[in-house]
Amino acid sequence: MSRRSMLLAWALPSLLRLGAAQETEDPACCSPIVPRNEWKALASECAQHLSLPLRYVVVSHTAGSSCNTPASCQQQARNVQHYHMKTLGWCDVGYNFLIGEDGLVYEGRGWNFTGAHSGHLWNPMSIGISFMGNYMDRVPTPQAIRAAQGLLACGVAQGALRSNYVLKGHRDVQRTLSPGNQLYHLIQNWPHYRSP
């Protein structure tokens, strides 16, 4: 084998790994989103589509149990959906996306369907992202924060959110303690947050 061939044989795998690493760091590449079928969601009965790209994102918390493993987060997503559909009589889980402390995003209604997270005024013009857990006295894990921020970057890259979208806390648009004192304080430092 010539010296040139040996050099290529050594360098090519490194260059391929470098290209793959750059590809995964592209903001158009979403944080992992757990699809509905993977967390065993009930079938949605929703039909009202959102008009994309959206100007607003509303961040809330479920105010219930937190989860930190894929298995516990899938169960928690099912619990939230069951409450929304079977107890409240909604067509699906109210949120467009749920964030677990396992660092994963769980698809709720997704980018295309109107949520039931912030009232009749805000639902048709916003995406609702809810952190699974209660964040009155603590912040979500760094993994959960990164997952949410990655989801927002993905929404912009895919054209679901405007590049100048405005982030709101649930309490900014409704009378509620959501997203909890600590999470609310945290999101106020995110670049797209705007006070009421």
From Swiss-Prot:
Domain of life from the UniProt record: Eukaryota
Key words of the record: Antibiotic, Antimicrobial, Disulfide bond, Glycoprotein, Immunity, Innate immunity, Pyrrolidone carboxylic acid, Secreted, Signal
PTM comment: N-glycosylated. N-glycosylation is required for bactericidal activity.
Record's signal peptide: 1-21
Gene3D superfamilies per UniProt: Peptidoglycan recognition protein-like (3.40.80.10)
Residues that carry a glycan: 112
One GO BP: defense response to bacterium
CDD domains for this protein: PGRP
Family as reported in the entry's similarity comment: Belongs to the N-acetylmuramoyl-L-alanine amidase 2 family.
Described function: Innate immunity protein that plays several important functions in antimicrobial and antitumor defense systems. Acts as a pattern receptor that binds to murein peptidoglycans (PGN) of Gram-positive bacteria and thus provides bactericidal activity. Forms an equimolar complex with heat shock protein HSPA1A and induces programmed cell death through apoptosis and necroptosis in tumor cell lines by activating the TNFR1 receptor on the target cell membrane. In addition, acts in complex with the Ca(2+)-binding protein S100A4 as a chemoattractant able to induce lymphocyte movement.
Name the UniProt record assigns to this protein: Peptidoglycan recognition protein 1
Native organism: Homo sapiens (Human)
